[in-house]
Amino acid sequence: MTNGYIGSYTKKNGKGIYRFELNENQSRIDLLEIGFELEASTYLVRNNEVLYGINKEGEQCGVASLKIDDNGELHLLNKCLSSKAGTGCYVSISEDKRYLFEAVYGAGIIRMYELNTHTGEIIRLIQELAHDFPTGTHERQDHPHAHYINQTPDGKYVAVTDLGADRIVTYKFDDNGFEFYKESLFKDSDGTRHIEFHDNGKFAYVVHELSNTVSVAEYNDGKFEELERHLTIPENFDGDTKLAAVRLSHDQQFLYVSNRGHDSIAIFKVLDNGQHLELVTITESGGQFPRDFNIASSDDLLVCAHEQGDSVVTVFERSKETGKITLCDNTRVASEGVCVIF
């Protein structure tokens, strides 16, 4: 049995963090329940037996740490709600487990926290830094919108996507916080959202929410150079849709991207050691607004959370040979689910 967690909005019926048990032998979710009620816990990241989630209480915003016990159940360690500037949308951990990074979409800021490497507790907010970059012309690009922050494969920097400014910004970081290093620009109105790095560290897959495209970019010393790009929806689709999540299979052979509105998952074959992509197929996600999904470590199953409609959580069997996914007859509900991790 594999334990997984789903983060959610808490605007309507969402409860914060859901816990589920994935039965990989039977290709189904045997249990899905409230793991821990945590307001606005829309993104999660795991460090072994500690789970970190976005959190807010009233006007105070920040992050929370939770202990995962032997049964997969969650117990609060502590919270660090040191800002009133807005609720985050993405969190990640540095390779040395000393820092927690947070991106705040609405306010266009990034935050950096110090962690206790022994207990996993959050010690303090080190810095809160606002983006101040020229923005694109799309109506949603009224100001900078930091959407993703994570350490680069070389370990030297953090890369931050800015949906409002159509770019990736890299920063050096240490105990004093962030220091601007480089920026990489994409097309106007792309709405640069998330990055998935190939294991070789040379290539990155950059997804753009507003243009519904994925770029293959060469990564070198904090800089991203676009090599090619692909649509993630059919060319003839003219409905309202926006790209969401991106994940590589663990064997690095296939890339998956979800589309909210078209309600699908696009599957690409990874070619030439990560340098090129080739569209395999686009598959219905089985629900409305597939905000996030993840692939089990076995590479056999994919679990997708849907933010809207009935907020179903769908399970797909996955072919390691073709990359294609097949919807299983097993759905659960995680209200307002927007993040899936194992």
UniProtKB/Swiss-Prot annotation:
Listed SUPFAM superfamilies: Nitrous oxide reductase, N-terminal domain
GO cellular component: cytosol
GO molecular function list: 6-phosphogluconolactonase activity
Family: Belongs to the cycloisomerase 2 family.
Name of the protein this chain belongs to: Uncharacterized protein SA1737
Natural source organism: Staphylococcus aureus (strain N315)
